């Protein structure tokens, strides 16, 4: 159960949530929680923070029917303009959060009331799994993954906090004017608010990579844990993650899967066999491993540039499944 690996959950209604429930998104934890609001000075803006329509104090559009207040500030004790031991969590250029904020997010998750145990996709599940990785490995997750997987697998273009290793010009910009980051261009900083306010390293978002590097991870999985002659995972672990499925949803452990009963709701093309595992991403990404045909399909785009609501056609027109379909149709010829 979760409290064995995350002491902060002891005594909360999350302490009996299992790792399997987190991986299947059946933990009962809500789909979303605006952690960043705790860092905002409530007295720095008038009225409500968000509005469905623009008005005199809400001009900045952040979604199809959502506008944010024009002016707000962060709490001075939580946000600084330069790095220090007390403010190490970089959210954007010249924006550093207090070190206590990361722990306060986990404490907040502990306090959020659980809902029923039906399937409910939630980033919070994977934020908790990241805490488990760190508490078991006794290392920050980015350093653990670097040491155990990315460096030995020569995934040289894969990193959390990529600006520590790469020039800004080498990184595709994610969003043009992020309202939580004072209208700055996000280039080399994670877009997802929860991951950003964790300092850029999270279980739900924050990893920068290339299609070639992502493919290596999926190749490792369908090759039973071996890559380039070296074993990284046991065959049993790979088999478990490739075959274990939920009894109440289409999901696998940590992975999404084709919906063989409902092609309209499926994240994959109809031609994809039920053995396929993978994931889609909010910023316009997807990666799928097909152990049956020994295929890996990776597609990376920056859908949310310049604005998060500009390219929703990627979903509406089913671009990712249709690209996958072309691949399977080519196999059948």
Residue ranges and their predicted role:
Residues 12-274:
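Short, surface-exposed loop or secondary-structure junction motifs
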Residues 8-9:
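Aromatic- and kink-enriched transmembrane "portal" helix at the membrane-lumen/periplasm boundary
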Residues 225, 279-333:
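Structured C-terminal helix/loop/strand segments within mature extracytoplasmic catalytic/sensor domains
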